[in-house]
């Protein structure tokens, strides 16, 4: 029986994901149920590097970065499920597929993105996930994602 874990802060996330600033896009894990689901957040600030050029007079978080953040949350779920608290040094989880991506609202400075990712299945090292991002309870983005665990 799976159990819902406590919060994982940025230090714990950095033990799992190889990403670093400016490409680490998950700030905190609120809930994680190994093998099933994760709920995490990204606090979007005006200081984000991508807002310099997207767009100066009307800053909007690029949709591809919302998708990347969802993939990072899926990666944390996969790592926590299969590797434990720390990613194994000889393995990485690669983002390998996306289907049914839809963007429903703009994400702007001051928003808090809430990621909800469900692990649908894992077969031969490839995981399939249903992912959604919300702002203030309103759906901002949804997609079906795949990631693959590979030895390096």
From Swiss-Prot:
InterPro entries: FabA_FabZ, FabZ, HotDog_dom_sf. It is an enzyme of class 4 (lyase). It is found in: Cytoplasm. Its main location: cytoplasm. Its EC number is 4.2.1.59. One of its GO terms (molecular function) is (3R)-hydroxyacyl-[acyl-carrier-protein] dehydratase activity. Keywords: Cytoplasm, Lipid A biosynthesis, Lipid biosynthesis, Lipid metabolism, Lyase. GO terms for cellular component: cytoplasm; membrane. Involved in unsaturated fatty acids biosynthesis. Catalyzes the dehydration of short chain beta-hydroxyacyl-ACPs and long chain saturated and unsaturated beta-hydroxyacyl-ACPs. This is 3-hydroxyacyl-[acyl-carrier-protein] dehydratase FabZ. It comes from Laribacter hongkongensis (strain HLHK9).
């Amino acid at each position: 029986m799976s159990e819902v874990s406590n919060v994982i802060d940025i230090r714990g996330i950095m033990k799992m994901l190889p990403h670093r600033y400016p490409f680490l896009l998950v700030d905190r894990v609120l809930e994680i149920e190994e093998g099933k689901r994760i709920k995490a957040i990204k606090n979007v600030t005006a200081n984000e590097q991508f807002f310099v050029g997207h767009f100066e007079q009307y800053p909007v978080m690029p949709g591809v970065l919302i998708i990347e953040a969802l993939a990072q949350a899926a990666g944390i779920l996969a790592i926590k499920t299969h590797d434990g608290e720390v990613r194994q040094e000889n393995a990485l989880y690669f983002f390998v597929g996306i289907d049914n991506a839809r963007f429903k609202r703009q994400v702007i400075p001051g928003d808090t993105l809430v990621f909800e990712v469900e692990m649908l299945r894992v077969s031969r090292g490839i995981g399939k996930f249903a992912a959604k991002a919300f702002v203030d309870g309103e759906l901002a983005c949804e997609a079906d994602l795949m990631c693959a665990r590979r030895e390096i």
